[in-house]
From Swiss-Prot:
It comes from Streptomyces coelicolor (strain ATCC BAA-471 / A3(2) / M145). Signal peptide: none annotated. Keywords: Acyltransferase, Cytoplasm, Transferase. Residues 366-697 are annotated as: Phosphate acetyltransferase. The keyword Magnesium does not apply. CDD domains: DTBS (cd03109). This is Phosphate acetyltransferase. Homohexamer. One of its GO terms (cellular component) is cytoplasm. It is found in: Cytoplasm. It catalyses: acetyl-CoA + phosphate = acetyl phosphate + CoA. Its EC number is 2.3.1.8. One of its GO terms (molecular function) is phosphate acetyltransferase activity.
Length: 697
């Protein structure tokens, strides 16, 4: 999975760009392909990204950097809710992540009042992106105690929202307080906290920025001079000695344009280095004569002299509202920022933390996006027998638009088209087949009759049977016209999977067909089996369910650690039920010694490390099981539904396993997203099939 670092904050004015630039510098030192993503953006130029692109020669298309603008995001949230907003942003993030080894995410800027809880939004986005969070806390014009409290609160906020907090950065603190704050924060948080002092040069506007903001005429000065930072403003209108005494390093001198003496005196002082200034701003739309300007240019080559029409004090009001920005046009600020970052941030420690293995946490949305991405990697054709069902049509549109797989929909073609048109659904790219009118019906009837001849099925009878959408779809899979099938939104489980048992049959290494659910909890995915097919498997069958479930888990990126569940743990229980689980566990160990398996084991000991430490200390599975095998359907079905309802888990499935080719059954209460997920899973299962990829009829 692509690594990502999410730099965010808790409010405006934290100088976060310093940290964002520093992290980018660090990443580009270690990784060849670094992408950038900004979830929400304001209208206008993005100076920081332009700096990153120029400095690090990024080839990334600027259009892919941004999730959406604030106005679009606000409208989407108002009309469809925050879940849809997050989902859309996650989609756009993954378009970037798939092309890079690591992604730097630039969090929101807390400048839009239409998102009053941006911290929670940033935390959720970070979790859904699978990103480690680097929160930045602003300390400008705050006491040491206030900064300490803000830093602790920020850590608790992001940590409490389930974020993987990489470290903390407290930025822009008063220089005189920096060491005290750093000492007081040391060892008080479970992650490093680096304290960076305020640097006036970073917040100071450049002379070029001032000229642009005031619409000033550039009378003298070159590009280097215009890039100087105006660290202070000094007003000159009195005698020259008074002005010279007031000069400070890096100041911009503001004086009426008719005071040639002050202009020459200031530039002479600059030339002598007592002190160097940023430039001179002339007011009242007056400029000294040619001779004075020639002298000025010789005294201080390159030093900017600007001219504006207004008087000094209105001009000053506008100047004090300006703040410097990091950008491609301010390379000096970039160097200052990097120097500050590298001095006060332990980059070796940060690099070690960034390079650490990705968190095992997987959110439901992350799992869903991984499914779609994996399905897209090798397109397969999935047949949907319930082509006239509204939910199936909506799911088909999603699958087609996102390029998850190729689709064939079954049913009366004109009825499908009319239903889609009524719903405003575009089925362009989908194949539509009416089994009753298909030219495949005859050959399918002959095939089915041959397969079921031992049951007395004739071609005439088979001709009627294969007009059923589920039988027709199953035969499409068997005969290579589709790679997999998904049905069940309006059909019973028996109606969906009976044709598969009769036609496709089980794999050579599978004793039975079984099922699993992917249980997507808040921070991980567990595999439950069997919760849908086998009522009371014996020890042999239970072992088969376990090994099949482990293979399915691995196929979908879940490292299999198998817990064979029972009402007792280890050797504490006895009786037929627990003996069955014990025997099945030994069969798994003998058949698949490469698998980690524990049993009999109770559910709490399987998933809770604290319980496992007491009941099965030293077990490689207890406390961290990822594949949970239930002893019977009664236990499994009730448990998955209980966890689904009480823990808010998303149950993806059932996913059938053990068939030669993939066929999956939907719940009749399946939502559109459930159908999308199941189709993606079916396509992924088909990718593992040794048979040739199916094509349209």
């Amino acid at each position: 999975m692509t690594r990502s670092v999410y730099v965010t904050g808790i409010d405006r004015g934290d100088g976060r760009q310093v940290v964002e630039l520093g992290v980018m510098e660090l990443l580009t030192r270690q990784v060849d392909r670094v992408g950038v993503f900004r979830p929400l953006v304001h209208d206008g130029p993005d100076r920081l990204f332009e700096l990153l692109r120029a400095r690090y020669r990024l080839s990334q298309d600027p259009a892919t950097v941004y999730g959406m603008d604030y106005q679009e995001a606000s409208l989407l949230q108002a009309e469809q809710g925050v879940d849809e907003l997050v989902s859309a942003l996650v989609d756009r993030f993954h378009l970037v992540a798939r092309d890079y080894d690591v992604v730097l995410v630039l969090g929101t800027d807390y400048a839009d009042t239409q998102f009053p809880d941006e911290l929670s939004l940033n935390a959720r986005l970070a979790n859904e992106f699978g990103a480690s969070v680097l929160p930045v806390v602003g300390g400008r014009k705050q006491t040491a105690d206030s900064v300490l409290a803000e830093t602790h609160n920020a850590f608790r906020a992001y940590d409490g929202l389930g974020c993987d907090v990489l470290a903390m950065v407290t930025n822009r603190v008063a220089r005189e307080d920096r060491d005290e704050i750093a000492e007081r924060l040391a060892h008080r948080l479970p992650v490093p906290c680096w304290v960076v002092p305020d640097e006036p040069a970073l917040s100071a506007p450049t002379v070029s920025q001032i000229a642009h903001a005031l619409g000033a005429e550039i009378v003298l000065g070159d590009d280097s001079g215009l890039a100087r930072d105006a660290l202070d403003f000094v007003f000159g209108g009195a005698m020259l000695p008074n002005l010279l005494a007031a000069l400070t390093p890096g100041c911009l001198v503001i004086t009426p344009g008719d005071r040639a003496d002050l202009v020459i005196g200031t530039l002479a002082a600059h030339s002598a280095g007592t002190p160097p200034i940023a430039g001179v701003l002339l007011t009242l739309n007056e400029v000294p004569g040619e001779g004075i300007l020639t002298l000025a240019a010789r005294l201080a080559p390159g030093t900017p002299v600007l001219s504006v029409t207004g008087t000094s004090f209105p001009t000053a009001e506008r100047l004090f509202s300006l703040e410097g920005k990091l950008g491609a046009a301010t390379p000096r600020k970039a160097e200052t920022a990097l120097g500050l970052f590298e001095r006060y941030v332990d980059t070796a420690e940060l690099n070690k933390r960034v390079s650490a293995p990705s968190s095992d946490r997987v959110t439901p949305m992350m799992f869903e996006h991984k499914l779609l991405e994996q399905a897209r990697s090798d397109l397969r054709r999935v047949v949907l027998p319930e082509g006239t069902e509204e939910r199936v049509l909506h799911a088909a549109e999603v699958l087609l638009r996102r390029g998850v797989c190729e689709l064939t929909l079954l049913g009366p073609v004109e009825q499908i088209r009319k239903k889609a048109a009524d719903l405003g659904i575009d089925l362009g790219g989908a194949e539509l087949i009416d089994p009753a009118a298909s030219e495949l019906r005859d050959s399918f009837a002959e095939k089915y009759a041959a397969l079921r001849a031992h049951k007395g099925v004739t071609v005439e009878l088979a001709y009627d049977v294969v007009s059923d959408v589920n039988y027709f779809g199953t035969l499409m899979v068997q005969e290579g016209f589709a790679d997999g099938m998904v049905s069940g939104s309006v059909h019973s489980t028996a109606a969906t999977i009976r044709p598969a048992f009769e036609i496709i049959k089980t794999k050579p290494d599978a004793a039975i067909v079984s099922s699993v659910f992917f249980m997507c909890l808040a921070d991980k995915v567990l595999v439950y089996g069997d919760c849908a097919v086998n009522p009371d498997p014996d020890a042999e069958q239970l072992a088969d369910i376990a090994t099949q479930s482990a293979s399915t888990a691995a196929q979908f990126g879940v490292e299999p650690r198998i817990a064979m569940l029972s009402y007792s743990t280890g050797t504490s229980g006895s009786g037929a039920d627990v003996d069955k689980v014990r025997e099945a566990t030994e069969l798994v160990r003998s058949r698949r010694p490469d698998l980690s398996v524990e049993g009999p084991i109770q559910y709490d000991a399987a998933v809770e490390p604290s319980v496992a430490a007491t009941k099965l200390p030293g077990s490689a599975v207890a406390g961290q099981a990822s594949v949970l095998i239930f002893p019977d359907l009664n236990t499994g079905n009730n448990t998955y539904k209980a966890v689904q309802r009480s823990a808010g888990a998303i149950a993806v499935g059932p996913v059938l396993q053990g068939l030669r080719k993939p066929v999956n059954d939907l719940s009749r209460g399946a939502l559109v997203q459930d159908i999308v997920n199941t189709v993606a899973i079916t396509a992924i299962q088909a990718q593992q099939s040794p048979t040739e990829k199916a094509s349209a009829q």
